[in-house]
């Protein structure tokens, strides 16, 4: 039997995170600033941006360098706690 805390993810790794929020001119820049608090080498040029069909929401895919489970959890907490963010996957 495998240990309960064993992760299915091998760290460190590049981990894609999808972030969705209301469309706003500063949404992408703000999310990049949040990510850079945890990944100083994050390349903002690699952010994938997808507006919703109605243009009311924006979806971003950001690929972060996750060092361990706690690091990844901290990134998720910072994103989900941000007022501009509606959903993080």
UniProtKB/Swiss-Prot annotation:
Pfam families named in the record: DUF493 (PF04359)
InterPro entries registered for this protein in UniProt: UPF0250_YbeD-like (IPR007454), YbeD-like_sf (IPR027471)
Protein name stated in the entry: UPF0250 protein Bphy_0213
Family the UniProt entry places it in: Belongs to the UPF0250 family.
Superkingdom in the source lineage: Bacteria
HAMAP family according to UniProt: UPF0250 (MF_00659)
């Amino acid at each position: 039997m495998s240990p309960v805390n064993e992760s299915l993810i091998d760290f460190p790794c590049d981990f894609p995170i999808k972030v969705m929020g209301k469309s706003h001119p500063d949404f992408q820049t703000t999310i990049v600033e949040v990510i850079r608090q945890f990944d100083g080498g994050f390349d903002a040029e690699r952010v994938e941006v997808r507006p919703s069909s109605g243009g009311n929401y924006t979806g971003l895919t950001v690929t972060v360098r996750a060092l361990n489970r706690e690091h990844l959890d901290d990134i998720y907490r910072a994103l989900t706690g941000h007022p501009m963010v509606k959903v993080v996957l």
